[in-house]
């Protein structure tokens, strides 16, 4: 059997991971390393080469959309349906399991998942029965407490009150709420996975049945798993299982990087220890001391990214390290772009634009205006140039190399109304028969970009796009421009009554987004960024949402951007409290120690004179320990590292 098509277009590291022998495997994916392709091709490899039945494969993603896309790509690669495979989100798979085994799970056959009104009604009855005042015991805060315990896999009997009367009462409410739900034969969203875990844990024959059936368990974004998700996966695979998990690689700075301390002195990052105080940005350019809570180091062999600013400031990091960088009107010089644009239902295309354009109703960066005009879903900056002609030459050559169209997704207005690109039917005839995904992935991998991390996600009125906007240091508790506690903000706009209902089920308070119109907004702040990201993760799974991460480092916020995604002409924030322009990007290959710090509350520090983010795992509410725990649970697991081409 010829299976060369399963490895075609993959680099050596990707091929090794895809064609790895049967056994536990941990794939650490760097920026722009093509991890999604590896998962898709691995499933196809298991079926066509290893002879695995689709019925024996369970694959987990974090959104329904990602699951649907993966299924579609697997079917395209194999040329056959993949319906027998279990592919979905953690909660979606748990729900499916409970529907099949409702009796063993202690549920009625027609059990319901609580909507917002029913959940609030049950909780209010519980509070009334316990003679508790709702103004003191706020339902939505109680629900977040209950959900947090379930995410840890904890029932009321497992939780310690630590001598805290408030916590003791919350545990009592949790117990009464749980009993009320059981009597009513209903479950909330967080209950699905915990109940599915207990179903297997308490029924060894059933667990063995599924262990025998699902010999192949694949997991995407493994670094984002929480406690109950990890427990559920490990229970299913068992010590003899064959898990194939993909997670993000470490994000670190090179040895010798000079970190600005609280007193203004500079010290090499390798000399800093937990408890030291560094200078940090509390938001809006408010630089103050912040405590280092953790230090991290590891050996690194591979490429490092050197970002050079016009002022001479330089920061050297792994390609995966997160910085704050973007295009800001005013500080950003005129720059010309070659971009890759994606529109759902159409595919990918190439185009050119520039920072400053004429005739705008309101000023915005050129590629943002183009994305808005074409109702695009995502956009990546492939390369930047100093002249329009250079960007257009790049567009033509790249289009020919990768077979990507340069035609617009929507008809152009203005001159030549009868021209080719002014007719929607002509444009549909171009894009409909094309499968541009593979070409787009090849291009993005070549330039070190990740298909899951676009430079721009349009804020759209289209209800199919649900952006979860998260702003580090977006607010401050204390009410003064300088001083106070940094608060981190999350906001989500619900464009339909269905979305609104989903958010309300989670206990989120909605308000009208505008005086007129049919949209609603949820917005809140938290001092703990990990807690905020836990909320964001829950919203993402329920709404198939996507993160838009920003840091409010000066008067204008900058996106979270990996070092591999930084482009010339972007601006970053330097220690003088101003924007500075990225002049050039260089790469170097080396074997060295790399380091990172975790900064209390603010999660940023100054490295090489540039404000940068600290380790991504430590702040987003996931359990970085799960990656280390996996290595302990599967000591024979083979490690594969995917790095940028």
Q: What is each PLM-predicted segment?
A:
Residues 23, 52-56, 81-84, 122, ...:
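Short glycine-/polar-rich loops that comprise or flank the Walker A/P-loop
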Residues 252-614:
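HINT superfamily self-processing domains
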Residues 3, 8-19, 23-28, 38, ...:
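Conserved helicase NTPase motor core
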Residues 1-114, 208:
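P-loop NTPase Walker
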Residues 42, 69-77, 93-100, 122-126, ...:
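Alpha-helical scaffold elements adjacent to nucleotide-binding pockets in ATP/GTP-utilizing enzyme cores
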Residues 43, 61-64, 90-91, 246-250, ...:
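A short beta-strand-to-loop transition that corresponds to the Sensor-1 phosphate-sensing loop
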Residues 125, 251-252, 389-396, 616-645:
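Conserved coupling/interface region of RecA-like P-loop/ASCE motor cores
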Residues 82-85, 102-191, 214, 639-643:
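ATP-hydrolysis module of ASCE/P-loop NTPase motor domains
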